[in-house]
């Protein structure tokens, strides 16, 4: 009898435990609530300011531990709205969040502790927020098939050009025409006037998601993530006016573990700007820009794959010092399977149609800065370009371990009027220490590299369209180098009467193998003060009028260069 009672007691206890367990699971699995903004007073009529109603809907979800804030079809005008943990905005088809035209509807940023530029205090437009901000939030998302529109036209003087004057026109080619090109309006940038700050901000957040939505007409940066850990952006479209300055697509600063996939970005300023971040992976995106499609600064362990770009400057990589912060190089970054089309354009945009651009700030006098860019690799890049690629280290801060593998540079003729006004200049702004060095007159090789150690050029092809402007010059030029490898190169110079397929100056340690001179090559290899000439073998130089200039230059291992081809 006691045994039966014990068994009954045990069975009851087991049933009680199961009830408790399933009750917990059921409670845990209850979905977060959905808070329809219209239920909290939002009109969605395109006229009424719905900031308060939207904020109340968010607050109602927050009280229940989080939830979905739902926007049905309509045009909801808002100023600044704050998002919190476990809040998910859902914009249904036909729903538009539209930025207020009244600048007073946007909150100041200092109370949030947020400053747009690298943690440095800012004033003016940088001291205002935009439409949405999340601070110290976890698990926050914006999803749906609707649109967030920043109403940029309300904050622009469309008949005034924006010229930052970060150059000295005395040192550019054709100064008068260059200056006139800075004031034209067709390509922008146009002048902003009293605009709000970044449209969407995630500041010190984690587990951020953007999916499906359309972001349009940002008057300033579009999406800014700062100190974010874990972000997934997928299947979104950003469509901004290409004339508006600073309307970057997505900016990541001091972020980790970011994924950006299957998205289209159309911006005036940088498409993607990644600064002091780590483990950023971008794939299967289309980017257009009047500035750089991708801008990278002091970022490491990141990949960019399967991209197409239609832009002024293609891929821009910088290694910089930030005031008061420990220098951190850009390193261990790979760009693969990318198609780039660059355009030379007038206006105050940074860039001169470079498909690939790497630069570091010069060191102060008598100071060795150390490596600022290293182990940056480009694989399978096809570029149709109106300007040359630049790889520019600095004295005391050489680029180290940069590789170009399977890269084709097809150089094409820019618009003649634009070429005459702004072509034939190197654009060194951002890394230049003075306006004197910002934009400078120069001939333009298809690929120019300076102050580089361990540069590897494998299967690089250079070809030129007929009738290139006379400022275009060599196929490849490398200056101030150590340990250079050129393998399986094919190319020639731009002009029939001057330049070389390869021009090497002031370096030590070079091997050239398996390479080919293209028809029309004047001089295949031109050398000036190059030491430790190691290997020059396995080539097809039948199309070169001259193989090596000057004739006295020889390699340690050199096979079959006819004397008649030394000049």
Task: Please place each PLM-identified region on the residue numbering.
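Bacterial N-terminal signal peptides
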Residues: 14-27
């Amino acid at each position: 009898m006691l045994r039966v009672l014990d068994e009954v007691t045990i069975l009851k206890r087991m049933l009680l435990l199961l009830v408790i367990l399933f009750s917990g699971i059921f409670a845990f699995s209850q979905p977060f609530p959905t808070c329809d903004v219209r239920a909290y007073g939002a009109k969605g009529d395109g006229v009424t300011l719905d900031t308060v109603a939207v904020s109340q809907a968010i607050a109602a979800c927050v009280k229940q531990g989080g939830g979905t804030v739902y926007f049905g079809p309509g045009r909801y005008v808002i100023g600044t709205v704050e998002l919190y943990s476990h809040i998910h905005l859902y914009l249904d088809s036909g729903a538009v969040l539209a930025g207020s035209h009244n600048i007073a509807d946007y909150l100041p940023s200092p109370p949030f502790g947020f400053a747009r530029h690298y943690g440095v205090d800012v004033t003016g437009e940088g001291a205002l927020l935009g439409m949405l901000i999340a601070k110290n939030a976890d698990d926050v998302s914006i999803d749906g098939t609707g649109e967030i529109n920043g109403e940029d036209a309300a904050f622009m003087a469309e008949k005034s050009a924006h010229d930052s004057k970060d150059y000295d026109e005395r040192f550019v080619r054709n100064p008068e025409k260059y200056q006139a090109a800075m004031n034209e309006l067709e390509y922008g940038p146009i002048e902003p006037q009293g605009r709000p700050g970044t449209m969407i901000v995630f500041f010190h957040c984690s587990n951020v998601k953007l999916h499906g939505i359309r972001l349009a007409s940002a008057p300033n940066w579009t999406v800014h993530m700062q100190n974010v850990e874990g972000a997934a952006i997928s299947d979104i479209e950003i469509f901004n006016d290409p004339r508006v300055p600073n309307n970057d697509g997505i900016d990541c600063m001091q972020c980790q573990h970011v994924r950006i996939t299957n998205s289209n970005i159309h911006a005036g300023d940088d498409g993607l700007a990644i600064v002091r971040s780590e483990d950023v992976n971008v794939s299967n995106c289309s980017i257009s820009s009047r500035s750089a499609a991708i801008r990278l600064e002091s970022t490491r362990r990141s990949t960019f794959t399967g991209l197409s770009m239609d832009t002024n400057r293609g891929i821009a990589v910088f290694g910089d010092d930030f005031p008061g912060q420990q220098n951190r190089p850009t390193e261990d970054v790979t760009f693969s399977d990318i198609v780039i089309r660059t355009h030379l354009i007038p206006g105050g945009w940074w860039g001169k149609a470079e498909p690939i651009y790497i630069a570091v700030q010069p060191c102060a006098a008598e100071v060795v800065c150390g490596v600022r860019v290293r182990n940056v690799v480009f694989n399978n890049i096809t570029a149709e370009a109106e300007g040359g690629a630049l790889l520019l280290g600095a004295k005391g801060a050489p680029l180290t371990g940069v590789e170009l593998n399977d890269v084709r540079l097809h150089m094409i003729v820019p618009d003649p009027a634009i070429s005459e006004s702004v072509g034939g200049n190197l654009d060194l702004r951002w890394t230049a220490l003075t306006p004197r060095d910002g934009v400078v007159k120069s001939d333009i090789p298809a690929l120019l590299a300076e102050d580089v150690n361990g540069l590897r050029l494998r299967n690089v092809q250079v070809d030129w369209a007929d009738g290139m402007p006379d400022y275009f010059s060599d196929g490849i030029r490398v200056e101030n180098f150590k340990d250079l490898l050129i393998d399986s190169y094919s190319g020639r110079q731009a002009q029939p009467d001057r330049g070389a397929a390869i021009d090497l100056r002031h370096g030590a340690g070079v091997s050239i193998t398996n390479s080919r001179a293209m028809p029309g090559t004047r001089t295949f290899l031109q050398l000036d003060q190059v030491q430790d000439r190691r290997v020059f073998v396995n080539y097809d130089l039948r199309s070169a009028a001259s193989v090596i200039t000057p004739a006295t230059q020889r390699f340690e291992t050199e096979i079959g260069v006819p004397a008649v081809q030394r000049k």
